[in-house]
């Protein structure tokens, strides 16, 4: 904003009060013309100046130390939060829940009497930190800006923060099962921040599957990746190894759609999936779904075909068809013959390739 616009914002916040010209100039210089910064800085200056003041005293009469402009927006917001008393703790709870939260969830997490809760919410709203929509207990609240939420959240120490996220996670799980079911990523986030890693991993995997079903492919990649990251931080167990294989293979399809078959990330994901299956088999823990390895090998086949890498396509086609013949599974046999046919015809072996295509057609069942 231009200086004239900045001064207009300051005037709107100050109202009929007066601040020294030097303080006004400090605000103008430190806020870089950012509207939120201007507004929050001015409010912080007014609140600092009005503490302990008699009603008739003007802001202009305060010494410069009382009207010191905070050095940053973060400092300004934190100073305003510190002056809210008990309402600051409510802001911290809200910040841990998210940028927007319902009255019902907030009330369940804080377990305060409704009158006390209403009083603290009124203070936050009056301070311009929260917006309210609707009437309690059916209302919802929104932090004025993400920076306000960040400032409130940033005042939490590590252990209280973890405990708060654990409380939110438990509340969602027990009292709001519909949210936990329909928004597993929300519950996963709180479990992650609470240090409930194993539970978080499975929830991120569930969230990834839901995103995949909705064709939200970028979100699915991020969520499956988070699930896998959580698992690798835990001590190994047969159950976690099964989950890791499942999530690693589930990651491949959305990753291919987002990055393309030839992307190194896709090859790395398929390599990792195949390695995990091989390790599980070596431990006597083969995947419960025998089709999982076929999914990985088929991904390699298509990636090789798209990259015009005949040698690699041939190698994976042989592996795929060999495994299908070993298991005598009709669908993998059909796909294996089709892949082998593509390899052979692509390398000039038309007669042999046609034989595999004929076998694939014979195995095909439209139903």
Ranges and model annotations:
Residues 113-114, 131-132, 151-363:
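Inter-helical turn/loop elements of alpha-helical hairpins
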Residues 4-222, 226-234, 276:
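Short secondary-structure boundary elements
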């Amino acid at each position: 904003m231009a200086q004239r616009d900045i001064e207009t914002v300051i005037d709107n916040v100050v109202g009929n009060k007066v601040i020294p010209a030097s303080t006004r100039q400090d605000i103008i210089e430190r806020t870089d013309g950012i509207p939120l910064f201007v507004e929050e800085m001015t409010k912080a200056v007014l609140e600092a100046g009005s503490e302990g003041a008699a009603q008739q005293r003007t802001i202009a009469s305060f010494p410069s130390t009382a009207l010191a402009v905070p050095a940053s927006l973060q400092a300004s917001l934190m100073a305003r939060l510190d002056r809210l008393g008990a309402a600051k703790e409510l802001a911290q709870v809200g910040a841990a829940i998210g940028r927007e939260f319902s009255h019902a969830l907030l009330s369940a997490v804080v377990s305060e009497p409704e009158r006390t809760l209403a009083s603290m919410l009124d203070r936050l709203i009056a301070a311009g930190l929260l917006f309210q929509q609707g009437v309690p207990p059916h209302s919802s609240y929104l932090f004025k800006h993400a920076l306000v939420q960040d400032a409130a959240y940033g005042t939490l120490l590590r252990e209280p923060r973890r405990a708060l996220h654990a409380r939110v996670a438990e509340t969602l799980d027990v009292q709001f099962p519909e949210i936990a079911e329909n928004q597993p990523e929300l519950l996963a986030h709180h479990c992650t921040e609470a240090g409930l890693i194993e539970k978080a991993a499975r929830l991120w995997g569930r969230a990834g599957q839901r995103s995949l079903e909705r064709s939200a492919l970028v979100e699915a990649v991020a969520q499956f990746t988070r699930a896998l990251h959580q698992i690798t931080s835990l001590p190994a167990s047969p159950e976690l190894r099964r989950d890791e294989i499942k999530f690693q293979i589930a990651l491949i399809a959305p990753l291919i759609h987002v990055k393309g078959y030839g992307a190194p990330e896709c090859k790395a994901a398929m390599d990792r999936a195949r390695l995990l299956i091989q390790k599980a088999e070596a431990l006597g823990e083969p995947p419960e779904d025998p089709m999982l390895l076929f999914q990985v090998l088929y991904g390699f086949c298509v990636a090789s075909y798209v990259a015009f890498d005949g040698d690699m396509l041939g190698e994976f086609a042989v592996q795929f068809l060999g495994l299908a013949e070993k298991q005598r599974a009709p669908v993998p046999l059909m796909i294996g013959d089709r892949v082998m046919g593509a390899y052979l015809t692509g390398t000039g072996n038309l007669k042999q390739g046609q034989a595999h295509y004929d076998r694939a057609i014979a195995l095909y069942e439209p139903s």
